[in-house]
């Protein structure tokens, strides 16, 4: 089990969002998504072969979920008292107890399950399978896959309107696919204007607006009722996650360049980019705690590239960390 500790940021507090704490996790491995538990004070972060669990108030290590090689995401089904991890290298989902974190089983899925989410309307868990280009639909009551939905493209992230529709970013098609969660049929495919390689996706359930973060430094606002592009907004480079705080009406884009783009939703059709708050290079995925209005971003320290052709810089050993961001 990795030991974690918190360091308070030493720089002066600015007028906007800033790093409040840094929670260090000295074990090795890269990461992907992070999630906030809806029933405890824990945050869960994917960490290559395991999921690290931290107390969000102190940064202390609570435990790990082991044997999740290639883990991407974490989802929670509170009514079933279960959590789920998507294990990309294993083509499986690990099921765990939402309070004790004890592993309860493993489910075979499509190839390379990436993002994972629970839809309270259909009472199903969905994995976005990047290699097989489909969704695995899991019944948490039985821990079985009950349907596979072909998407015809690489799914990146999915969100629900909690009223019978699922929206999925199709990264290699620059579109959003709309799935009926009663029939499990793809009903529509919407192009997203100038957006290229959509990754992060969030939704405002009240205004029925989708927020798609794209690889070409744009966030596309889409009407979830008809697919019309409402707004194209500038964001930082390297977005791989989008979060939404329904209470504050803030949309967040976590950018690998080391910034957090903060956008205010003034109304369903009126948006303003407030700032690109400094975070840290590599902080590209995000979890928003709507209870505390804090934001969590995993990243690490990196060595300088030895070869210009090197795709990613080497991660410094023992430097994995979670940034806590707020006002």
Show the residue positions of the predicted features:
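Predominantly soluble domains enriched in secretory-pathway, periplasmic, or organellar proteins
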Residues: 9-327
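Bacterial N-terminal signal peptides
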Residues: 1-9
């Amino acid at each position: 089990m990795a030991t974690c500790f918190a360091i308070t940021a030493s720089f002066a507090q600015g007028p906007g969002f800033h790093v409040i704490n840094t929670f260090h996790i000295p074990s090795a491995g890269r990461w992907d998504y992070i999630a906030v538990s809806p029933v405890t004070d824990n945050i869960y972060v994917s960490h290559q072969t395991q999921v690290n669990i931290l107390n969000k108030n102190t940064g202390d290590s609570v435990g790990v979920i082991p044997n999740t090689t290639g883990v991407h995401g974490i989802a929670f089904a509170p009514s079933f008292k279960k959590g789920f991890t998507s294990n990309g290298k294993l083509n499986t989902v690990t099921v765990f107890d939402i309070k004790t974190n004890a592993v309860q089983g493993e489910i075979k899925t499509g190839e390379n399950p990436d993002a994972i989410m629970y839809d309270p309307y259909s009472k199903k868990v969905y994995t976005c399978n990047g290699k097989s280009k489909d969704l695995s639909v899991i019944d948490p009551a039985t821990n079985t896959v009950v349907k596979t939905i072909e998407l015809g493209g690489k799914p990146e992230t999915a969100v629900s309107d909690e009223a019978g529709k699922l929206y999925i970013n199709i990264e290699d098609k620059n579109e959003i696919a709309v799935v009926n969660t009663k029939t499990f049929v793809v009903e529509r495919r919407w192009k997203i204007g100038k957006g290229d390689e959509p990754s992060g996706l969030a939704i405002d359930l009240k205004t029925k607006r989708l927020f798609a973060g794209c690889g070409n430094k744009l966030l596309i606002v889409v009407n979830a009722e008809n697919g019309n592009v409402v707004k194209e907004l500038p964001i930082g480079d390297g977005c791989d996650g989008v979060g939404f705080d329904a209470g504050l009406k803030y949309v967040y884009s976590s950018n690998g360049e080391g910034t957090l783009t903060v956008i205010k939703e003034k109304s369903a059709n009126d948006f303003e980019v407030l700032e690109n708050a400094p975070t840290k290079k590599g902080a590209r995925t995000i979890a928003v705690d709507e209870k505390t209005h804090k934001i969590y971003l995993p990243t690490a320290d990196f060595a300088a590239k030895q070869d210009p052709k090197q795709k990613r810089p080497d991660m410094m050993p023992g430097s994995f960390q979670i940034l806590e961001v707020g006002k």
